């Protein structure tokens, strides 16, 4: 039987994902692993939203979409546009690689008590003008602040820039953070 074990996931927990070929061995494998791991406090995990945001792990469809370029998402270093002959959008990617994006993913720290769920884009504002949007946010018990991922225009993406975030519970003061927390 083929098994694939991947050290991957959306947290700093250092877990593994196991993929089996065929479902008939899944339950037996599960029970065997849980029993063998019990003395070592091994258990099943799940994605951790807070750690995902603290670490700047982007969620496709939420923090980045097909509408974003790799450069906007901080992934430009993985694009080899010089050899991408025939690639649709190559010219645009070459231009952005040379000139830089006009907006980019940034870490944001939102002031105040815990924010509610970010179930829609929250506008990022400066003096009444929208300069970006928060796509993921959560209270971080480790850092005692609200951590967020947002797409911010280059005019306001420098670390320390003060902005306002229009949460569903009202306006919150925020600032662009130097980097993600973990």
Regions found by a protein language model. Name each.
Residues 1-182:
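Conserved, structured C-terminal
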